Amino acid sequence: GKGPVAAVIMELIQGEAGVMPLGADYVKAARKLCDEHKALLIIDEVQTGIGRTGAWFAFQREDLSGGVTPDIVTFAKGVGGGFPMGGMISFGAELSALFTPGSHGSTFAGNPLGASAALATLGVIEEDNLVDNAEERGKQLRDGIASCGNPLFVSVRGRGLLDAIELAHPCSHAA
């Protein structure tokens, strides 16, 4: 229906759609519209966050976001190292003040075991430099596939270790 829009929620890379980046110009246009209409820009980093794209969050990559900072970032999956955990980050004092201790920001957030798993996971990612490693290994993977000359591979795309290979022929059976 008609009326004010509260928020725009987007993934910077459409993972389930085949690892399709939105593009920095699209994200900048969305930010502009959100600002004009006083709507929040929320970036869903459930699949792209916690280092998978070669940055802690995909929105931190200039090539994906055009330098846009969202109002809210949501994240899960990677932060718990296999244990269900989710969270959100809000930017700006006014918005952050709305989320006080005890506020419900995620189904799996706020439990002691999940928080411990997240702290341990983040510690390993940082100590072992896994964010930079994802960027380097992803580039190595994409360059290797692109240069192998196999006619089965039409294209390869991605950021960090979130990648897709487009095949020349559909594959109808499980890999």
Regions found by a protein language model. Give the residues of each.
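Conserved N-terminal phosphate-binding loop of PLP-dependent enzymes in the Aspartate aminotransferase
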Residues: 1-175
